[in-house]
């Protein structure tokens, strides 16, 4: 790697480079738009120094990508290490959000149209997509949503996930995290599992 470009950075730019490296490694995804619909300073800086980030991260086995269509920058480990393992509830939530995001895009919405409330999310999961038999407890729900928030899959637009009216913005990074074909495959598998569990519970509760 040539450090010529890095050496040309002033002290403030070097500090910002270090900060942005730590940020994207912790968050995985860097959407262009902030919750206030301004341009993210991390996105702007990484984009402006993209070749430098690309070379630097490659040294430790990472690739950085810039998806201009979705307006998101993200990283992947070359060997497939450091993948985030999601529990069952978080997986159900992110699949539901991915389906909602795609629905809104198909309806002609913009990349920033994926705004829902916690209550609407749960209604979709329970009634429409049949992925949950009932509302999960608040602690598990909040933990799952916080994981997605930490990785810039969603933005929390209101104060508290406990509130069913709390607004959540589904970010375009969800389309990178879960491609459409994979989403459908996982959804069908999860729904089949839920239907099987429901049938087993009904059998256990029946009297011949």
Residue locations for each model-derived region?
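A short, conserved structural fragment
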Residues: 59-66, 145, 149-160
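Short basic alpha-helical hairpin corresponding to helix-turn-helix/winged-helix-like nucleic-acid-binding
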Residues: 54-114
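Eukaryotic partner-binding/assembly regions in large regulatory complexes
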Residues: 1-80
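Short, amphipathic alpha-helical interaction segments positioned at domain boundaries
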Residues: 169-208
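Accessory beta->alpha helical hairpin/"wing" motif in late/C-terminal subdomains of nucleic-acid enzymes
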Residues: 72-77, 155-181
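Short acidic, hydrophobic short linear motifs in intrinsically disordered regions
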Residues: 31-40, 110-126
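Short amphipathic alpha-helical interaction segments
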Residues: 45-53, 132-150
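DNA transaction DNA-binding modules
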Residues: 45-48, 64-67, 104-107, 117, ...
